[in-house]
Design a protein with these regions (language model features):
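Interface-prone segments of viral and bacterial extracellular assemblies
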Residues: 1-185
Length: 185
């Protein structure tokens, strides 16, 4: 019927939005955007925490008819994307080696099996070793791999662990931690 649309074939979780995949419901309002006529606000680090009102105006609608939505810039567009392809395992000496592949939010073109360029000032990561929702240890790294040693496990848990859960973050000099990649081993 008039004014109703059925959306199908949508690609979700693109360009670092996977954390929002499950946040929409049937019957929810949406704005259909096309590249032509779309203006993206240029909000840099100085705009983080600033609240502004925005209106979405379509063909046949005037600015005065559109409802304003308040938005506070959280800097999420500046956060590094979550790493992907987390891998690893427990070694014979009880150390855990965990590795991953970084993603880029800037200059993301695939170049014949070569990693995307680091889109941050420096390549830096933090890996949280978890116990439920409690962070037991944070390990920093400047490469996409860490070793969680047997000695660290004994300090953190009182014994070597047969399973672990990690949250991996790439870091930004501007906004700190990016989005987490979580995995249980």
């Amino acid at each position: 019927s008039a004014g109703k649309y059925r959306l199908t074939g949508l690609l979700r979780g693109r360009r670092g939005t996977e954390q929002h995949i499950g946040t929409h419901t049937a019957g929810e309002r949406f704005v259909l955007l096309t590249l032509a006529g779309t203006i993206r606000p240029n909000a840099g680090a100085a705009e983080i925490g600033v609240e502004r009102n925005y209106k979405a105006v379509s063909v046949g609608t005037s600015l005065s008819q559109a409802s304003a939505r308040t938005f506070t810039n959280t800097g999420s567009g500046l956060k590094p994307l979550s790493p992907v392809h987390l891998s690893g395992g427990r070694q014979p000496n009880n150390d855990w080696i965990i590795g991953w592949t970084r993603r880029g939010r800037i200059d993301t073109a695939w170049r014949d099996s070569v990693d995307v360029p680091v889109g941050e000032t420096t390549e830096s990561y933090e890996v949280d070793i978890m116990s439920g929702t409690t962070v037991k240890r944070t390990i920093t790294s400047v490469t996409p791999e860490i070793t969680y040693t047997s000695a660290q496990q004994v300090t953190d848990f009182g014994a070597n662990q047969t399973t672990i859960t990690v949250n991996v973050y790439q870091k930004s000099a501007t906004v700190g931690r990016g989005f987490a990649a979580a995995r249980a081993y």
